[in-house]
Amino acid sequence: MTLSTEESIEMFGDINLTLGMLNKEDIVNKEDIYSHLTSVIQNTDILDDAIVQRLIYYASKDMRDNNMLREIRMLAGEVLVSLAAHDFNSVMYEVQSNFRILELPDEFVVLALAELATSYVSQSIPFMMMTLLTMQTMLRLAEDERMKGTFCIALEKFSKAIYKYVNHWRDFPYPRLDANRLSDKIFMLFWYIMEKWAPLASPMQTLSIVKAHGPTVSLLLHREDFRGYALGQVPWLLNQYKDKEIDFHVTQSLKQILTAAVLYDIGLPRSLRRSIFINLLQQICRAPEPPVKENEMKASSCFLILAHSNPGELMEFFDEQVRSNNEAIRVGILTLLRLAVNADEPRLRDHIISIERTVKIVMGDLSTKVRNSVLLLIQTMCEKSYIEAREGWPLIDYVFSQFATLNRNLEKPVKTNFHENEKEEESVRETSLEVLKTLDPLVIGMPQVLWPRILTFVVPAEYTEALEPLFSIIRILIMAEEKKQHSAKESTALVVSTGAVKLPSPQQLLARLLVISMPASLGELRGAGAIGLLKILPEIIHPKLVDLWKTRLPELLQPLEGKNISTVLWETMLLQLLKESLWKISDVAWTIQLTQDFKQQMGSYSNNSTEKKFLWKALGTTLACCQDSDFVNSQIKEFLTAPNQLGDQRQGITSILGYCAENHLDIVLKVLKTFQNQEKFFMNRCKSLFSGKKSLTKTDVMVIYGAVALHAPKKQLLSRLNQDIISQVLSLHGQCSQVLGMSVMNKDMDLQMSFTRSITEIGIAVQDAEDQGFQFSYKEMLIGYMLDFIRDEPLDSLASPIRWKALIAIRYLSKLKPQLSLQDHLNILEENIRRLLPLPPLENLKSEGQTDKDKEHIQFLYERSMDALGKLLKTMMWDNVNAEDCQEMFNLLQMWLVSQKEWERERAFQITAKVLTNDIEAPENFKIGSLLGLLAPHSCDTLPTIRQAAASSTIGLFYIKGIHLEVERLQGLQEGLESDDVQVQIKISSKIAKIVSKFIPNEEILMFLEEMLDGLESLNPTCTKACGIWMITVLKQQGAALEDQLLEILGTIYHHMPVLRQKEESFQFILEAISQIASFHMDTVVVNLLQKPLPFDRDTKTLWKALAEKPASSGKLLQALIDKLETELEDDIARVEAISVACAMYEVISMGTSVTGLYPELFTLLLKLVSCTLGQKMLTCPWSHRRHVMQQGEQQQIPDPCRLSTATLKCLQAQAMREGLAKESDEGDNLWTLLSSPSTHHIGVCSLARSMAVWQHGVILDIMEQLLSSLTSSSENYRITGAAFFSELMKEPILWKHGNLRNVLILMDQSAWDSNATLRQMAIRGLGNTASGAPHKVKKHKQLMLESIIRGLYHLARTEVVCESLKALKKILELLTDRDVSFYFKEIVLQTRTFFEDEQDDVRLTAIFLFEDLAPLTGRRWKIFFAEEIKKSLISFLLHLWDPNPKIGVACRDVLMVCIPFLGLQELYGVLDRLLDQDLPRARDFYRQFCVKLAKKNQEILWILHTHSFTFFTSTWEVIRSAAVKLTDAVVLNLTSQYVELLDREQLTTRLQALRQDPCISVQRAAEAALQTLLRRCKETSIPL
């Protein structure tokens, strides 16, 4: 082994480490160290010299150390020897240095030298002379037994090395050495050991000498001068055969000596040879202990050497020894002969006759071992052509005789050792059969030995089991001869001399070969060999058969090629060949002789064998072909009177007479009649029952009549049927059932079976006659008999074949005319079904059997009975041309097919499978849909038998309708149903469904589905799943073509839903089915479901959701609903149907159905529906016809159409938000409350519009386009909805950019003049929002818009309109100039002022904001006017600074800041700035400061404030009343005397006095303060109060 550099370094390091450990005195680990070193050294190519030297040193030292354990010393020696491969000279030097003359060496040094001599022969030979000389001086010193043994080992190995050199010196790399000098030394050593040590040697030492003996003598034989002495020592060696432990080594040494003698061509002395023969034979045949196997093999090889050198003398020795009766010696010699023959020793061939004679000597030996040995020797002799033509036949005959000996030897068994003898005889038989199988008949000389004497073994029954190889031998011989004849000019025909052997007659050969051919149908090679032999033996059988068999036999052999065929068919073919052959021969004497030969073979076969049954039929057929009527008559009489010669008398006589009747019906019937008249049947019957006499009974004769009818010529049968056959059978049956008018043995099974068999065969015969005009008058009577038999059978057991046979009889009788009525058929079938299917399970039936054979019989009866019932049902059903009648008969099985007992289901399905086979053609109108639905799901039933039968039946349904399926694929799938894995079953059933579903007639789908739905309700879980899979598969395949049946299908499904809801998995299949139908007929399904009453029940909701679950069809479903809703809302009126659509949409959308593509249409329709159902009650009560289960005290809720519609719209918006089409409403969930209320609907719509995702402007534009019509709708509610929606959208610039809102603007303007306040409000809002969405449109349409909006200011009855108008004006005015507004300015100002005191905060606030916005629009024209209007409005602004609504206070502050400049009162800004502080000033303080400033600037305005204040004293707001009083107080305080005098003191005092009684304390205090101020000011001016 070559190592890499790295590995070498690592290895050397390892060795160095190991050497370091060897240097220690640690003995314990040295054994492992040396074992490791041995492995390393032997697996390493190169070792460092220094390492080698160190290893040699340590190994040699430890090897010689007596203190070391022997095992360690031995391992050290192995290491030392292994090192010789790296440095031989150093190792040899080390060993030789410790191997010195006249010094007794260490034992292991000698062993090391010996091992070096054998392991390194080439290197050792040069040192051998010195070693031997030294060793010679040491032998005298050896006294220890172990040391002597060591020297013997050394002598053995030195001799082997020198022997190798002597015979192969040319292969050695140095010049030839003088081998004689070496052998001289070996001789001296050997002489010393044999003379000095051997006589007194212990057993152990003797063993060592024996081992050295062979190699040493073998070496010495090459020297003539030593040869005598060497051979003289062989007897000593032979004398050592004493113990099994040493015998092998003696034989081994002997073999080495014999091999050397052959090599050197040395002839051993005769006495020595004989001694060797005897000793070796004893080793092979030693008794009582068997020889050691290895020793026996060595001894055998010694004999082979002797057979090569002295074959003649060896054969003489064998001949002498084999004559003794010693079994072991005979077996040993036969075994040695077999080995010698098998070795194919050329010199042994000269002694073939001697070998044959030796074999013949022991042929009479009855010992099993001897016979087996003889057979094996004959086998080898045949293989090696050691058979001599003249003397060889007895050996072949011996082989056959030993095969047949088994039966003869066991006929009289020895009771004590019977089983042992049987085994031994069987071994002989097997050996002889093996010899025959391996016999090559074409080996030189064998054809002359075998032919034609080999034919003598064909006919005797004892050679039956050997016929297969026998036929092969005969066929090879004949075919080889034919080949020679074709290739050679001169005939080399086989020798036909038979000597004393008697050959079989042609009739015997034909009879035997025909009978033996029968098992060929079962695949037996013996049968095929027989028919093959017939093919090549026509000339031997009869010359006339050559041409016939030349054509017929190849046809006969064809069905056998590669497969088995029906036994019945094969039997028929053979009988037909026999018929044709006999007619061809046409020789009465020849036929009569064949009859006798058939009879002679009766005892050769058992009654139940196929051969025996065929033999009876062949005998009957031969009689039928015999033209001698007298002979036929006599034979029939003989069989009737002495039937026991046939074996089974009933079967035999029945078969013979039946087949004989084919050509001799008159003779058979006449002889039968005569026989009946002559025999006393009653007594005869009793004798057969009680005395055991084997004679025919009446029941036997009944059976015979049936067979005769079955085989009778059809043209003759019907004319003689009633009187000569049926009447006789009925008469015999009646006689057996009654004696002296009394019923006896009415339960006799044999009687019933015989009667049934006879009737069955008669029925078959009549049917085969094919006479359409024949009316079988006994039909109903005989069927009645059969039914009675069946009724009498127990329902809890199956012990008799009566049911089975009676069913068969009924089947054949039912086919005959006159035809039975449908009711008769149904009664017959129902009766039989009820007597078979309810039987207990098969295992329970079998448990009644006491033995395994009984159990097998019960199972056989069970299988046959079920098969017969299936065939009966099949016959009665399909013989009927009326499809409805067939269906009626099939319905008889329906209850059993769904039975809760699986064994009943199993039987029903197995029967169904027999009925639905591919060889049937159903009536034209036969419906398979319902049956398919019934059968198919059970392909996943609990039992594999049910699954297989269900699948077979399912496939069969299509075949009977003439529909051809993928046979191979279906068969493969069907086989897979054997699996117990439920998932595998479901998968296979699904595949079958996919294959066959497309072939179901369209008009039968409804029936199929009805059956499947029933199955979903009632079957087990696995079958239920199969139901669902089949239903879905069929709907997938054929759903498109179901339009005409759709409503019925849907109705059927709905009908089953309440029950199936309790079964979750089944219900899921229902939903899947609806979805599948909808995928083809969405509109129809939608319309159908919409007809469900409102509110939808749970099932209806579930159906809608199920339809929505399918991504592929959900969009289609939504579109269908949209179309339906669109149709329902065409006239802007919402009917109940529209509400149903909305509810359906809710269920669909709630399943997460994508609305992206349909959202605009959905949204507008649902919004329209909400609008149209505002305030609407349900017009009709579609739920009234449906009963609701309600709790006690619960009231039935009447659905609100608007709320239902709103709920759907809410669901839509939620989905739209998920898809990014809308956003959350600013109203939250309150939106939907607003939307569904008539009073707040427009608010909800606006909020909904604001939730539109502006970024999805494409979607909104689609919505706008569809919603545009709402503005001109005849429905006021819908117009409001549209106006409200558009009012919000009009503030979106992007929509003005991409959409056509101009038309909307025009329509909005028109709506602003509508009489409906809400509509006007929404229109005005839309106009106002235009300012945000399209400012340019405002300027363009300012006149139109302003007029419409200003008009809204006059709608005083509805503040919502006013407020909306104010807001709209504010937005629009922000975009206009004074010139744009000039024409409308005054009107706007005046109308705006009217709303400063409005009760609605929003109106007040908007009016104030608007007034502020009007300031910049006064222009020159309206500046003075506006200033005057400010004066009038100033008090409102001042008072409302403390409005309850803080926003209004801020607005008043802002408007004051804007309006002050118009009055030239800029000085007031400082006072107004105080209003900007975080904490507002007190009203009193503010007003006084304001009035102080105002009084200084403009007393007129101060007076105006006073004159307008009285109206506010009665304000509904406390804070305004208080502020008004405080302002009055400030005004009075700051009026000049002139204006004080103008005060209406009385009125003012009265009002203030009244306010002192105000509920508000603040007002009271302000009024009191104001009165005091008034009083003080009046005093100041001397004005009395």
From Swiss-Prot:
It comes from the Eukaryota. It is found in: Cytoplasm; Cytoplasmic vesicle, Secretory vesicle, Acrosome; Cell projection, Cilium, Flagellum. Pfam families: HEAT_Maestro (PF21047), HEAT_Maestro_2 (PF23210), HEAT_MROH2B_1st (PF23221), HEAT_MROH2B_C (PF23227). Constitutively phosphorylated on serine and threonine residues in acrosomal region of the sperm head, midpiece and flagellar regions of noncapacitated spermatozoa. Phosphorylation on tyrosine residues increases upon sperm capacitation within the acrosomal and tail regions in a protein kinase A (PKA)-dependent signaling pathway. GO terms for biological process: cell differentiation; protein kinase A signaling; spermatogenesis. Coiled coil: none annotated. Keywords: Cell projection, Cilium, Cytoplasm, Cytoplasmic vesicle, Differentiation, Flagellum, Repeat, Spermatogenesis. HEAT repeats lie at residues 28-65, 228-263, 272-309, 310-346, 405-445, 531-569, 572-611, 662-699, 777-819, 964-1001, 1021-1059, 1112-1151, 1157-1195, 1258-1295, 1363-1402. GO terms for cellular component: acrosomal vesicle; cytoplasm; sperm flagellum; sperm midpiece. PANTHER family: MAESTRO HEAT-LIKE REPEAT-CONTAINING PROTEIN FAMILY MEMBER 2B (PTHR23120:SF22), MAESTRO-RELATED HEAT DOMAIN-CONTAINING (PTHR23120). Found in a complex at least composed of MROH2B, PRKACA isoform 2 and TCP11. Interacts with PRKACA. Interacts with TCP11. May play a role in the process of sperm capacitation. This is Maestro heat-like repeat-containing protein family member 2B. The gene is MROH2B.
